[in-house]
Amino acid sequence: IYSPQQITGVSGIDLGDNLFTVSSKDTLNKLKAKLPFIETVKFKRILPDTLKVTVSDAEKYACYKSGDKYYTVSSQGWVLEETSEPSENVFLIISKSAELTVGKAVRYKNENEKQKTQEIIKYLNAQKISIDYIDVSDDIDLKAGVEGRFIAEFGTDSYLEAKIKHLKSMTETIEEGKSGQI
């Protein structure tokens, strides 16, 4: 996605810098702030005077809605871009406490909401249920759009894993073409 010149220019690493004082964490943060579609950065020091930097591209994973904007994030939780329309081929996360800034990790004002989001995603993925959206904006009305045809209403997060296992069995037994709320 980015050229070697872009990466080198933003990294803050200059010719002649001491190989052992270059901070991989600082460099990663600089790169992600300016070039958000970078997922990881690996360093290989080749003595006496070479530092090889390898980056991997971030892929769009999910999309948060905040006001009238959409924020696409990677699977690692880094905000990749801000758009006026949701990205295609990713699921939507509806949250009232997510703080979203391009080039930074998603932050939650409410740690409980973050945990619920992660659990729902984990359990749905474990059951291989296709996610359309997740709504964690109300503690007692958690829900998800799944399989392109169902709205699963979980209520609270009590017994969430069991509820999602039951959801899997229901989606497998309901005939194709039928949709609704579960």
Protein language model regions, located:
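Charged, solvent-exposed interaction patches on well-folded alpha/beta domains
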Residues: Q6-N18, K25-K34, E39-I182
